[in-house]
Design a protein with these regions (language model features):
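A short, well-ordered alpha-helix in the C-terminal region of glycosyltransferases
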Residues: 231, 317, 323-344
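Conserved acidic donor-binding segment of nucleotide-sugar-dependent glycosyltransferases
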Residues: 296-297, 301-308, 317-322
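Acidic anion/phosphate-binding donor-loop and adjacent secondary structure
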Residues: 120-123, 160-176
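A conserved mid-protein helix/loop that constitutes part of the nucleotide-sugar donor-binding site
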Residues: 18, 22, 177, 181-200, ...
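Short hydrophobic beta-strand element within catalytic cores of glycosyltransferases
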Residues: 272, 277, 281-284
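Carbohydrate-associated surface elements
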Residues: 141, 159
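N-terminal subdomain of nucleotide-sugar transferases
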Residues: 1-60, 364
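Nucleotide-activated donor-binding/catalytic signature segment of Leloir-type glycosyltransferases, i.e.
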Residues: 220-242
């Protein structure tokens, strides 16, 4: 009998959490998803493809502490058959999932991504991991962070849609190196370092930064200070449907992530995998799992985080089309082998099915 799960997420839907939609859709299509509970509302942005299919199953829990939200969830489920509860992040969603599972008398599991693991005190996270039926880690960096004696941690990376993000012809050259960066305008994305790097370049360059966030004014001021208003453009939020065209515009994609002043960092940002799937070279920082994946893929240079000079040197190295061609091919081949969405989501579904249906050994990656 197929296991039936209630899943607790954070805000839903959110532009920055495309991976959640793909995995939830896979659970729903496998007839494993009872309901999706969000601990708060989403970001109000244009939803990703597939979100509409999820909306009939979505409930936004009333504001309150974790115990109150868990109680509301249990009441809403009523007599529905639930074989397990999965928290999609290690902080509040996992806490609510654990409490609701206890009330329902079933097991719980949770996923861990990046900042969510660092929002929970180390001792509390370790206890939660040991109490869970299993933990799903989406990259090696965070897997190591949550691996403790007695915990069952499984590395199951998110995938990328290889049909949506595919190689397209490069733009006609106008003599400029076209650089794209995508992400929320927050400190950990390292976009201020990227702007500083572009200011150092001795080759003609056009930089587009796609996203919105609290750092907008600071980044705009940096662009003005460097005299780059004709070189760097903050293009705002891009929908999931617009992103393939953005990658097609670019000669390469920069992912200059840093560890921010609060200790937050990216794990393995979607943009890096989408860029590789699109056949574009990647220039990335050596942060968390990002540098290791790009080195393994041979899809572009890896530079120290926050080092504008090193980033400028890497961009200059890729100014010639001949220097970029093989990197884009290598990146596409790598994501086809390791991050195909259908394969990755199937592994997550099989893992959760095995875990919550009482199989002795959960399916590993």
């Amino acid at each position: 009998m197929t296991a039936r799960l209630a899943v607790v997420v954070s805000g839903f839907p959110r532009t920055s959490e495309t991976f959640a939609v793909g995995e939830l859709l896979a659970l729903a299509r496998a007839d494993m998803l009872v309901r999706v509970y969000a601990t708060k509302s989403g970001d109000g942005a244009a939803p990703q493809p597939g979100v509409a299919e999820m909306l009939p199953l979505l409930r936004v829990l009333p504001a309150g502490d974790a115990a109150q939200q868990a109680a509301a969830m249990v009441e809403d489920l009523g007599d529905a058959r639930v074989d397990g509860v999965h928290g999609y992040f290690a902080h509040r969603p996992a806490e609510v999932a654990a409490l609701a599972a206890g009330d329902l008398g079933v097991g719980f599991s949770f996923s861990v991504h990046a900042l969510d693991a660092r929002k929970v005190p180390a001792g509390e996270l370790a206890d939660r991991a040991r109490a869970a039926s299993g933990v799903v880690a989406c990259n090696t960096d965070v897997a190591q962070h949550v691996e403790v004696p007695g915990a069952h941690v499984h590395l199951l990376p998110h995938g990328v849609d290889l049909a949506r993000f595919r190689p397209r012809p490069h733009p006609d050259s106008d003599g400029h190196l076209r650089v794209l960066a995508v992400g929320r305008l927050v400190e950990k994305k390292g976009f201020s370092t990227l702007i500083d790097a572009v200011a150092r370049l001795q080759v003609p360059c056009l930089l587009r930064i796609a996203g919105t966030g609290a750092e907008h004014a600071r980044l705009a001021a940096a662009i003005d200070r460097h005299g780059l208003n004709d070189t760097v453009e903050l293009v705002g939020r891009r929908s999931h449907d617009e992103l393939p065209d953005d990658y097609a515009w670019a000669d390469l994609v920069a992912v200059p992530s840093v560890v921010d002043s609060g200790g937050d960092r990216d794990g393995l940002p979607n943009v890096a995998l989408e860029a590789m799937a699109s056949g574009r070279p990647t220039v990335v920082s050596d942060v968390a799992a990002l540098g290791a994946v790009v080195r393994d893929a041979s899809s572009g240079p890896v530079v120290p985080p926050g080092d504008a000079a090193a980033l400028a040197e890497a961009l200059t190295m890729l100014a010639a089309p001949s220097a970029r061609a093989e990197l884009g091919v290598a990146g596409r081949r790598y994501v086809e082998e390791h991050f195909a969405l259908a394969v990755c989501t199937r592994r997550v579904v099989e893992h959760l099915e095995a875990m919550h249906s009482g199989a002795l050994e959960p399916v590993d990656a």
